[in-house]
């Protein structure tokens, strides 16, 4: 994700509710599949780890609230602390951020400890971008530079497997949203679920746990902030990698169809995630 200043100017958002016909069939199919799965409402809150201010839970928070599921949000940049264990939480979610998973930060190492506890105790865990990289590191994988950075709506290839269909549905959308320059190797025992032309490891599953390099939690408000990025780092990436790094106009133009479809995907996989709660 971009390192967006808190006072960054916002571009006028495109109306993503219009012109959504391109990805409408996958979105409708995923919505129907999600509706057919009984959402488990755990009696304990979901622990959500937010690393930086610009990368909040967005659609994840909206979806949890709509399902009546309590969320315990802890943000590193806000000065929050992490619990020592997961006994008071039914599930774990890790968000993204502009930090590297390899940074020497006590918060990141504590987050990895919680991931290992979650796997050992079968507490279902979902990771987004940096959160997925932390999951990979915690479980024995490595994180390093991606073959090419990815920014914007990218086409992806979903594995032809029962596990991939379980998480992403029988008709996943054509594109998902990315903002990353690093990626992960697969931990031992993990199953690769998706890839892109620029990054072969996009998602993996390990039992009831899912790690994704992309941002299914994106909503229009978050996209508005991210698409306003004019940092030298982003502009350099845009100039050097025009095939895999998109500008703000492309992000908004593609969002008309891609964002509703991705949110249907998110609802589906979040439902599967909570289905693993004990």
Q: Positions of the model-derived regions?
A:
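Pocket-forming structural segment of enzyme catalytic cores
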Residues: 139-225
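Catalytic nucleophile loop
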Residues: 117-142
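C-terminal helical/coil "lid" or tail adjacent to the Rossmann-like core of SAM-dependent
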Residues: 207, 216-255
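Short, hinge-like loop/turn segments at secondary-structure boundaries
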Residues: 65, 89-93, 142-146, 162-163, ...
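N-terminal beta1-alpha1 cap of cysteine-dependent amidohydrolase-like domains
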Residues: 1-5, 19, 25-123, 240-278
């Amino acid at each position: 994700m971009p390192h967006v200043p808190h006072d960054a100017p916002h571009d006028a958002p495109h109306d993503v509710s219009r012109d959504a016909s391109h990805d409408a069939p996958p979105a409708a199919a995923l919505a129907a599949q999600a509706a057919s799965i009984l959402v488990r409402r755990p009696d304990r809150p979901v622990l959500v780890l937010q690393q930086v201010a610009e990368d909040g839970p967005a659609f994840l928070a909206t979806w949890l609230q709509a399902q009546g599921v309590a969320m315990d949000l802890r943000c590193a940049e806000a000065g929050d602390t992490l619990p020592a264990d997961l006994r008071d939480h039914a599930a774990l979610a890790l968000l993204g951020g502009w930090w590297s998973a390899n940074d020497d930060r006590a918060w990141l190492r504590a987050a990895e400890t919680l991931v290992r506890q979650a796997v050992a105790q079968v507490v279902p865990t979902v990771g987004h971008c940096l959160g997925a990289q932390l999951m990979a590191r915690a479980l024995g994988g490595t994180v390093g530079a991606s073959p090419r950075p990815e920014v914007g709506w990218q086409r992806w290839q979903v594995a032809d497997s029962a596990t991939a269909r379980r998480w992403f549905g029988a008709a996943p959308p054509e594109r998902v949203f990315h903002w990353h320059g690093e990626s992960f190797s697969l931990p031992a025992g993990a199953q690769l679920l998706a890839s892109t032309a620029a990054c072969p490891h996009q998602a993996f599953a390990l039992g009831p746990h899912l790690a994704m390099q992309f941002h299914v939690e994106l909503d229009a408000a978050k996209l508005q902030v991210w698409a306003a990025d004019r940092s030298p780092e982003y502009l350099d990436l845009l100039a050097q990698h025009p095939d895999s790094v998109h500008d703000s106009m492309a992000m908004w133009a593609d969002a008309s169809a891609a964002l509703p479809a991705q949110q249907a995907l998110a609802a589906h996989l979040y439902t599967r995630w909570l289905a693993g709660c004990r």
